[in-house]
Amino acid sequence: MSEKFSLWLRCLHWVNFPALAIMIWSGILIYWAHDVYPGFFPDWFYEKFKIDHRLAQGMAMHFTIGWIFTLNGLLYALYLGVSGHWRELFPTLQNFRDVVPTILHDLKLRREKPRQGKFNAVQKIAYTGALLLGSLGVLSGFAIYKPVQLSGLVRLLGGYQMARGVHFAVMVAFILFFILHVVQVIRSGWNHFRAMVAGFEVEDDDAGS
């Protein structure tokens, strides 16, 4: 067995996973009350999941879990810096060149496995992108929550309506990331999932021979 993820990283991940899910769900409850992009979510979607007329519930959940999501994100950023984990996570120029070969290998269209360390090129870009998305989501969220007190931030984001658009785009991007992440976890098998739970991954005996 080899250590894959530290205890700190696992704890932060398993706090972030449900927090992000609740933030997305409560965000949709809030969005229903002011559908600025009509038709993006069809009526059957609202009816199926009973989303209509739940603005107060959505706001209560969003503002409560939002603080947990933000604090967890700050702790994660601190962990990256203190532990040096950022060196394994942040992509290099070579990683961007390896994106296509990595995807082709993942789809079984390329036999040769691209170079990689703890994370492959696509994982590095996706996880770093998620970190940037989270930061943008928090900033745009504060901008539309306190537009008068944080008028400078609102202007930086292009105005109130633009800040709302950015916040909505972040939510959609996180939904896509969420789906792809779960699919990849399922595809990678139990060994990788166990590593995020227990911290260790079982290696094949042939791997080192």
Task: State what each model feature region is.
Residues 1-209:
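Membrane-embedded alpha-helical bundles that constitute the cytochrome b-like, heme-associated redox core
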